[in-house]
């Protein structure tokens, strides 16, 4: 694995407040890394330090193996796209995309070729002569991306780039981002608070909370095995049950089934239905169950089996296969 950038014990304090707390992080070259976590966890602060917009209180940031902790942003060779696209309104789409190339004094003929190629890459070749304000949000987003990519950055940094788009477009642009990253082989670091976005896009996802890294790895490894309750909650796990030996287990609502008999392996709990919410293809069945230790735990089962007819007040059994019961460290 070639390393594009590295955080070594990087801390950022604002007065008494520690926004980023001694993180170590490796950004692999040619891959897409997401920094994922709730608001305030230090994602943007980390990205800004990587970009050079803020200097760590302590620790080092290496880019291509070179200590770049104090290198100014314009000398880091990075492309960046923010939540607000920050396009130049008085320039055409092509001029926006060519802006960084002009600054770098690329000859006009070559610049024209690179701009055309980059606009084709993001599917906007036909809008080269338009002004940004004539474009939809999704199109403006692509222009901002094209402008950042045109300079062939060592690292492409994206801060919540899709969060201003409506839900449908956002999902479409995820696929587009993946395609563009695969076609260009760029190293991308993306900040998001959206777990679905991180799961779908990442080669490596880094789950953060309160300035620390809780877990990192490929989505296929992190998702089925969250390191602790905080990561599990952030990834949409519910139904936390403590067993007699003190271990904490969790099951996703879609893996809890209504059954007529206890299953031998896995988890089975009995309880009373509190609520049934109809949601079209599925129903959310809320149950107050006995955890086997005399305590009541509230469980939610996402039931897709139309034959199940649970009603509030019914006593039912909820069960999950062993394969879907995740044991947490803490
Ligand atoms: P969000 O998604 O809301 O941007 P985030 O995970 O990106 O969240 P950061 O923007 O990195 O979080 O902020 C982390 C914490 O540091 C927050 O509590 C924020 O208020 C604080 N913070 C960030 N920048 C500064 C600053 N310049 N001065 C003081 N506090 C700051």
Residue ranges and their predicted role:
Residues 32, 73-79, 83-227:
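ABC ATPase nucleotide-binding domains
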Residues 6, 26, 62, 317-319:
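ABC ATPase nucleotide-binding domain
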Residues 44-47, 143:
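ABC ATPase nucleotide-binding domain helices that frame the ATP-binding cleft
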Residues 36-38:
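The feature captures the beta-strand-to-loop junction immediately N-terminal to the Walker
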Residues 247-330:
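Non-catalytic connector elements of ABC transporters
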Residues 51:
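Helix-to-loop junction immediately C-terminal to a conserved catalytic motif
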Residues 59-67:
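Conserved ABC transporter NBD signature motif
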């Amino acid at each position: 694995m070639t390393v594009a950038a590295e955080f070594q014990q990087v801390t950022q304090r604002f007065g008494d407040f520690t926004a980023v707390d001694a993180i170590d992080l490796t950004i692999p070259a040619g891959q897409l890394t997401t920094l994922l976590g709730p608001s305030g966890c230090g994602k943007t602060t980390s990205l800004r330090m990587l970009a050079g917009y803020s200097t760590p209180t302590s620790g080092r940031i290496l880019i291509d193996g070179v200590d770049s902790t104090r290198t100014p942003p314009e000398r880091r060779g990075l492309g960046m796209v923010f939540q607000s696209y920050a396009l130049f309104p008085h320039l055409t789409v092509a001029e926006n995309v060519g802006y960084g190339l002009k600054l770098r004094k690329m000859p006009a003929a070559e610049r024209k070729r690179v701009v055309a190629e980059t606009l084709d890459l993001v599917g906007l070749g036909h809008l080269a002569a338009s002004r940004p304000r004539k474009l939809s949000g999704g199109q403006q987003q692509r222009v901002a991306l094209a402008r950042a990519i045109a300079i062939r950055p060592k690292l492409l940094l994206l801060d919540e780039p899709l969060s201003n788009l409506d839900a449908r477009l956002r999902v479409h642009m995820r696929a587009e981002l993946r395609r563009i990253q695969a076609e260009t082989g760029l190293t991308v670091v993306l900040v998001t608070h959206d777990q679905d976005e991180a799961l779908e896009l990442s080669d490596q996802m880094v789950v953060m909370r309160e300035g620390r890294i809780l877990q990192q790895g490929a989505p296929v490894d992190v998702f089925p095995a969250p390191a602790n309750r905080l990561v599990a909650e952030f990834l949409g796990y519910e139904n936390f049950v403590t067993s007699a030996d003190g271990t904490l287990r969790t099951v996703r609502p879609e893996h809890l089934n209504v059954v007529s008999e206890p299953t031998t392996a896995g988890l089975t709990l009995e309880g009373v239905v509190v609520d049934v919410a109809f949601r079209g293809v599925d129903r959310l069945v809320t149950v107050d169950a006995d955890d086997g230790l005399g305590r009541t735990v509230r469980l939610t089962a996402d039931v897709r089996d139309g034959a199940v007819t649970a009603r509030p007040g019914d006593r039912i059994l909820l069960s999950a296969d062993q394969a879907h019961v995740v044991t947490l460290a803490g």
